[in-house]
Amino acid sequence: MAYDFPVVESVRSVLPVVDEFIIVAGDSSDGTDELLKVFDGEPKVRIIRTVWDTQTYDRGGMIYAQQTDVGLRACTGDWCLYIQSDEIMHHDALPVIREACAKYLDDRRVEGFLLKYVHLYGDYRHYIDSLHFAYPREIRIVRNRPDIHSWRDAQSFRVIPDFNGVDYDVEEGTRKLRCILLDALIFHYGWSRDPRCMVRKANHHNALYSKDYKPVEGVDYYDYGNLGMMPLYEGTFPEAAAERMAAYDWADFVRYDGPRPNIGKRYGVKYRVVDFIEKHILRDGRRIGGFKNYKLLKP
């Protein structure tokens, strides 16, 4: 795995709560196919092989949404739980998810569920506490309906009637899903990977968002900035991530002094004021502005 995604841990973290798990595996030469052999003989896991069409889906990371839809359309259950390969579900979330899916199965108002996020940063101890740099909640469970699609770069989902199968960033004629927020944590490891892999991952990822992107060259590892300026996560971590976290081996490539992390939405004056209001005045998880691609329902 050239980009150090916790694929195996991600899948294993949700297997106990699903009837079937579909892995959409694109064409690659980085050892992913070999890695996925760990699931040979696992009756719940089905792998769909695909070829990424980056000519058609050539902007804004829409190839991620298209690939997500491949998996979504292959699902057969009432509810579809979605997890990206850099996300790991907390074990305490599983009974919460199971109960909610049963409770709201026949309540057609509810089209999806939001999960709460912990975005780890730099190593496995620090996290991003800015609600505007990293989404604090997102849709990760949706009803299995043909008009519900992955949206934009697959961060979220949307109702898109008569979808043309190409324009995953369309807004006109679409609408947000009606969702309930669950007290269930999902951990994002996208910003807490080996800095040597992070350079390669950033180049590949950014190229999928812009055809004009010029890759960074001559850099051996990614600089996360001064991790001492980021808060420590004090809660428990997903059991499925225990082995990976115990193998942490890039302490020599991160620092705890010097210039701060390059997170404009955490350190800019505007966002520091907004963060203060949200955390110390509102104190209920609400955000001022920001990306909210859902209609929140009361349980």
Q: Could you say what each language-model-derived stretch is?
A:
Residues A25:
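Short beta-strand/turn micro-motifs composed of small residues
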Residues G61-A65, D69, H91-P299:
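Catalytic-site signature of metal-activated, phosphate-bearing donor transferases
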Residues Q84-I88:
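The conserved acidic donor/metal-binding loop of glycosyltransferases
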Residues E20-I22, R46:
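A structural signal for isolated positions on well-ordered beta-strands in alpha/beta enzyme cores
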Residues V7-R12, D33, G77, H91-A102:
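Short alpha-helix within the catalytic core of nucleotide-sugar-dependent glycosyltransferases
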Residues D4-E9, S29-W79:
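Active-site-proximal specificity loops/subdomain of glycosyltransferases
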Residues M1-E20:
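Short, well-formed alpha-helical segments that are part of the catalytic scaffolds
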